Amino acid sequence: ARLSRKAGNQRRGIAGYMDTSYYNRFGGEELMRRLASETLLAQGPMGSVLLSECGAADIPPAFWNLAEPQTVSRIHRLYAAAGAQVLITNTFQASGHALDQDEIAPSMAEVNRGAVDDARQANPQLLLGSMGPIAIEWFVEDSLEYREIRANAREQASALLNAGVDGLLVETVTSIRNLQPVLAGAHDAADGMPVLVSFAIDDKGDLLGDGLNIEGAILYAEKHGANSVGVNCCSLTAATAAVPRMVATATTPVTVRPNAGNPVQTQDGLVWREDPEAFARACVEWKRAGAAMVGSCCGTTAVTTAALADALDI
């Protein structure tokens, strides 16, 4: 792993002093440089692939980071072999609150560091630390609940950055209320490291939770420090329609990672209808419209990643 150490480098965060000596400054700079100059290919999902493993339907994805690290690393290696330049840690639901809800015993820091170590086994060009929404209701900013979400996000962000990720990815954001304390917590820990934000939208381009259009969501995220904005876990149609709208609005690099559509319940569990060729055709449009990073989300596999790599001529 590429680690940039600055002796005694500390900053005062909302919870006091944090040691940022192990933050991967060079990796963060490279991530932003390449987002500004290339169309990068990100890996596909971790959760839906892990859930499809034999007998794993009821096992929280974060559990695998320490219990079966070789399985997590194998999935990352498949994506890297398919052409993914950006890997994403298996930490979407690995905040302290989420781990408590899933009754996962190891500490939040151990689970997140394990996920980074698992991904590093695939020798990624770039590595993003995934952060998902935190399921705590809050009503007033600076309330006890708001501060709890912010603290959870800050602690997870710090764990990921200290483990050596090149940047943070706050993804599948369904509302501004969903985003606000998580983004604040991520920035509490980031100390200048990149924080990317990705929204979940419907086919009209509106956020799934509060109905805000993608333009408004982008303006909010950028105003509050997002270094990149995008969409994920939406339909292919929604993603393709959203890219030019996002590029026209954003002042930061735009990302796009749709899913494979709605799964179908079968005797063997949930099954997605993966269509790599459709993703490859759409990818040409995303790149032409100005997307800085493309990829795929729930229901896809390394087969779709390979099709996207072919479309990008990687």
Predicted regions and their residues:
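Domain-level signal for soluble alpha/beta catalytic cores
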Residues: G16-I314
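N-terminal amphipathic/basic-hydrophobic helices that include classical n-h-c signal peptides
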Residues: A1-Y22
